[in-house]
Amino acid sequence: MQISLLLMQQIAQLFLILLMGYAVVKTGLLKASDSKVLSVVFVYLVMPCVVLNAFQIKDTPEIRTGLLYSMGIAVGMHVVFLLLNALFRKALKLDAVEQVNVIYSNAAALVIPIVQALLGEEYVVYSCAFVIVQLVLLWTHASACLQGSAQLEWRKLLTNVNLIAIAAGALLYLLHISLPAPITSTLSSVGNMIGPMGMLLAGMAIAEVPLKKVFCTPRNYLPVFLRLLGVPLVIVLLLWAVQASHWVPDGKSILMTVYLSAITPACATVTSMAQLYDRDASHSSAIYVLSTLLSILTMPLMIGLFELLL
């Protein structure tokens, strides 16, 4: 349970930063709309630096095996997500916004700083596997679901800066190209901002949402329960049933980096997509806010179960 306690401590630290972001808006120092500037820095500078730096590792058979393993697990998890969604959609009458919020997590922004703190910088590369799979599905399945059509956003997928950074990092890794020390130091320094900046943005976003409406609307709790507890519980039981942690050397730690991505709150990008496709963005925003706040309790709980079973 040590990892679970460390995770709780790390999430508590991130939550305090979230409160700072909330406070600067509520005190009138900034407007919630001012977060757009930080969002640009976060998406176009910080995240790519983290990804590029993650791939600056020695190419060994163990790492290659770990990458293939994490990618396979990530694909398998998303297949389960989609199957569960097909089941929940009809049984629970989930609308498109709720479905997409249940399937897609805020993995990129939240998991990477947690993995850095809990397991070390060398494990960040494995969390990229989940991000790759999610990005592909986000701009294909999720966009089609929100549009109510089969039209796919290939251009947005292929021009996504994080996917480009992953492709560039993977290419450098495969070609055994090590960047000069000043560059890797710069990437590391900028990348270290991912946790604080991500939570400041979350806090600023939460500040513009009426929390009374978020907490007092019963319907909000259904997709949040599925995202934080229902789906992660099914996933961890399946991983336990097939003993996935024993498939490769260091399997439990690598598996944890991928599982952490599956238990994070709803994806912030979904709310932006809901606005783009004229869906109920306020409902999506409420799910994001509620799931982000409740994940402080549920993530350590699910990791505790992961440690117990695997």
Predicted regions and their residues:
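Alpha-helical transmembrane segments of multi-pass small-molecule/ion transporters
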Residues: M1-L310
